């Protein structure tokens, strides 16, 4: 079995592959040097096309994941897709996700709406509503004590124009003047025509955190802001309000604690927000459900 996914949504580490992932993993890095999309695509394809495996498990919607799935399909290997059927109209990932859904043979989806979409895209066989397995790692959280900290997790818009980026930064500068500190998690490797990545790299030092450290940092933050799916999927379960900026995640289901960016008014709303933190991506024991499905293959 090969599992293909980003090692941590928080730290934006190199894309990695884990072989024999049910407890006996071997990590293979796609590599920091592969910053250009065509190199990362090629490397992902090569890893899967040349390796020995029976089942490929992939999560989400990245172009590198599409390459891995393409290689598996060409080798007539079984593909299990997690988090299909979701929508992010402002990102290239939306098209990649749907393409992966068409090529996969087994689907573990996170929400009821995603289940219905995959049923339409892929047919009624082997579609399972499991919830988001990554949420199972969010447990044993300390008491929340916001400490004038903001988590910034922003990536280049791939279909939008980053028009909300400057207003967002203006709001954050105002908060810094009021004594808040900003923790930036670092961007991904998407094309960056607006120069957002260069600006952030010039003004912030990325905080390299494990996934657990990211969860704990978010737990004590006043809010999370940016355009990462983690603000929509993980933050409600962490119990922290989040602000969704721009168009990258447009169409993605969200709970009431996810606030759409609308200038400083949305900042004030997030700071004052105290609940509820309902999460449409949560199902009990999602990881166990996925593991049971994998064992049955």
Provide a role label for each language-model segment.
Residues 57-59, 66-70, 81-82, 107, ...:
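A donor-sugar binding/catalytic signature common to diverse glycosyltransferases
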Residues 6, 13, 100-166:
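A nucleotide-sugar donor-handling region in carbohydrate enzymes
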Residues 88-105, 218:
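A conserved, positively charged/aromatic
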Residues 1-32:
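N-terminal subdomain of nucleotide-sugar transferases
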Residues 113, 257-297:
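Leloir-type glycosyltransferase catalytic cores
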Residues 17-20, 33, 144-220:
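Donor-nucleotide binding loops and adjacent catalytic segments primarily
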Residues 109, 128-130, 206-208, 258-264:
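Short acidic-hydrophobic, aromatic-tinged amphipathic segments that line or gate anion-handling sites
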Residues 48-63:
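Short N-terminal targeting/anchoring amphipathic segment
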